[in-house]
Amino acid sequence: MNASPTPTATTTTEPATAVVRCRTRLARRVVAAVGPDGLLPAPCESRVLESALALALLTEERAEADATARLTAYLRTTLRTAPPDPFQCAVARAVLGGAGERGERVGDEGDMDAGTALDAGLDGFDHFTAGRKRLMFRTVLAALGATGFPAVPWEAYDTRPQQSWLHMEMKALKVLAAHGTGHPDVVRDEDWRALLPALEPGPAWECNNLAQLLALLALRHSPRHRPALGDVLKHVAGRLRPDGGMPFIDGMTVFTTAAAGLALSLLPAPPACVTPMADALALRRNPDGGYGFHSGVAQSDVDDTCYVLEFLRRAAPDRHRTAVAEAEGYLLALRNPDGGFPTFARGTSSEIAMTAAAASALAHDPDRREEVDEAVRYVVRHQRPDGTFERSWSRNATNAVFRAVLALTGVAAHGEERRSRARAAERALAHLAATQNGDGGWGHAEAEPSDPISTAYAVIALARGPRARPGGPLDRALAYLVERQHPDGGYRSRPDQAGPRPLLYDVPALADVFVLLALAHATATPDPEGCSR
């Protein structure tokens, strides 16, 4: 059941020398960034949505004048120089207000009304969460006075067992809609209780600024709780980034440390920091055995748990035997009856990328063969005719493809099952070859400009295909990555992470981490221990 990286032609050709040099420089940069606590810092950059909500909150409360000025400047500058998606532009314009702001042209969205901007922002978002996102985004715009509140039953704001911050967000939006439409009586005590963690001092609850800001805006409508906002707003103002904006989340330290540790452990001579990195992650497991995306996040998820599990198993399986077993137990507890895995809660929709990740993470345990086979079958069943898969927490198509290819090729199979998996992997790899840009890279979608992160994901998949031919898709992709390396050894990339989906957010450290993981896969030799990520 090993899932060893497949050696490629890059290990023996002249271009391989450049690739190895590139890998070495990048690895040194990543190692140098690991802190004394064993974690790789991964702060999140400012985003327009949270910055606008923070500005709205501080303005309404007449608090933190310096932070208000900084947020205003950040929003005006960003709308003028680097406008995001139409929805976020509409939110920012609603908060900034004034004829002058509304009259400025903001990219192609400058003349859109809020409703049109919402439609444009969700255009092409084909996902099982699309209905809820439309409700969320429309309610945000309505609460800011940009459009009317959606005419939906109040139950539409209720959530089944979901991630903790989504529960808070939907309760906050319900309160805002109820008070905005003159129906405060529909707000129940349990709705208010769900918002109270937002009043805790210090970092945002669950490191999620979006959830806290929505909750604080809602708590303004509570005579009982509004007086407590003053102290909290000081902490909110203290979380602004150097550019004056507010990030979506505090960071992704657990996620990036696990992925970086996995990449470093694939190198011919793993650096000494790998063991402290594994130790640091093992200490941060949650009571349910899983892991969240950042230190201090109590909500575990399949994505982070899979990365941590694979890294711990490869770097220090005996040393962290308990953590490995508990992570496996967490994953198995979330497995759905259809054989797939959701991101956060059993019973919610299974996702391709999460299912493929779980299959790869569990594949090293022979006692989990049945669950792994079911997960791989789920992946095969849900492949699209063009060879792609539904996107998940990444906006680019290559992310789901690389995770699926690793699952499809990482577990031994026989007979028709083996042929079925091979066909699925071939279709996925053929799609990558057919959609590669002329510069050797890939973008978020076909024909979009190439970027290092999207290309790195594709390289991981291609490295698992048949032995690469010189000058083929893999060699061209590696040449693209070599050429895009900065003098400091690092990378800058268009962000691909989305949350709430499909809104992009930027964690710059991810570019270095995933390019290193790609280069490690592309230059690896067979290893009896195996590694599937």
From Swiss-Prot:
Catalytic activity field: (2E,6E)-farnesyl diphosphate = (5S,9S,10S)-drim-7-en-11-yl diphosphate
Gene3D superfamilies: 1.50.10.20
Matches recorded under InterPro entries: SQ_cyclase_C, Terpenoid_cyclase/PrenylTrfase
The keyword Lipid metabolism is annotated on this UniProt entry: no
GO molecular function annotation: isomerase activity; metal ion binding
Cofactor-binding details, from the entry: Requires a divalent metal cation for activity. The highest activity is observed in the presence of Mg(2+), but the enzyme can also use Ni(2+) and Co(2+) in vitro, while is inactive with Mn(2+) and Zn(2+). Binds a binuclear Mg(2+) cluster coordinated with Glu-169 and the diphosphate moiety of FPP.
PFTB repeats: from-to residues: 274-316, 324-366, 372-415, 425-466, 474-517
UniProt signal peptide: none
EC number(s) reported in the record: 5.4.99.-
Active site: D303 (proton donor)
Residues that bind (2E,6E)-farnesyl diphosphate: R132, K133, Q163, W165, R501
UniProt-annotated binding residues for Mg(2+) 2: E169
Annotated Mg(2+) 1 binding sites: E169
Domain of life: Bacteria
General function of this protein: Catalyzes the cyclization of farnesyl diphosphate (FPP) to drimenyl diphosphate. Cannot use geranylgeranyl diphosphate (GGPP) as substrate.
Record's protein name: Drimenyl diphosphate synthase
Species per Swiss-Prot/TrEMBL record: Streptomyces showdoensis
